[in-house]
């Protein structure tokens, strides 16, 4: 496994990606949007680099933080595999989907009754799937207006936070960062104290990503 460095904004360095791809490379996997700072990866450019260097290598995109915020066209963007989770768009937990480009062969992890096109045997979570579908419909109804509102709120929030002395805004503004994610550091302030102070005022934030909740300390993403 080869791990790639990112630039100061959290974006994959395309020149390093090009150097890392070998004739025996079978898969390249990146996020679409970073869940901590909101950095948006140039997935189309990444795909072009991969296919130019090794056309047989597959490109997987973790779109869990991007789906619902962006209009994603896997075929047009050169994505072979795309994973999405329902709970990030206000759908039920425990449901998601994997887009598999036509012609890509994937071996199932679970064998048995052949449900879900033979990819994941076992009784389907019908209520979860229905809830996911309803969430997708709601999210993409008046989608452009919803995203513009998010962008406006994020810009206002980051502008006001930037006025506070000792504040570092880790998330960029504009197209370089997702509209729903704001990462802020406060010099000399313990995150736990700030969390409780904000909670008393009905404001709820997190001091790190959910996937690192059992590993207290400085975020590896922010360290890098």
Language-model segments: residues:
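Pyridoxal 5′-phosphate
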Residues: 1-224
């Amino acid at each position: 496994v080869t791990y790639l460095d990112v630039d100061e904004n959290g974006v994959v360095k395309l020149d390093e990606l090009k150097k890392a791809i070998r004739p025996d490379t079978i898969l390249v996997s990146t996020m679409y949007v970073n869940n901590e700072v909101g950095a948006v990866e140039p997935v189309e450019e990444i795909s072009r680099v991969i296919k130019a260097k090794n056309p047989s290598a597959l490109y997987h995109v973790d779109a869990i933080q991007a789906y619902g915020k962006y209009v994603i066209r896997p075929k047009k963007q050169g994505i072979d595999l795309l994973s999405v989770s329902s709970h990030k768009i206000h759908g039920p937990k425990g449901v998601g989907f994997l887009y598999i480009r036509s012609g890509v062969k994937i071996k199932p992890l679970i064998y048995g009754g052949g449900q879900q096109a033979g990819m994941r045997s076992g009784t389907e979570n019908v209520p979860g799937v229905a809830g996911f579908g309803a969430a997708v419909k709601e999210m993409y109804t008046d989608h452009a207006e919803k995203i513009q509102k998010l962008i406006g709120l994020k810009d206002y929030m980051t502008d006001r936070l930037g006025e506070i002395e000792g504040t570092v805004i880790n998330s960029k503004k504009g197209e370089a960062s997702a509209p729903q994610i704001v990462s802020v550091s406060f010099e000399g302030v313990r995150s736990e104290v700030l969390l409780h102070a904000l909670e008393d005022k009905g404001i709820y934030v997190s001091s790190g990503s959910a996937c690192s909740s059992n590993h207290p300390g400085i975020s590896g993403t922010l360290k890098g």
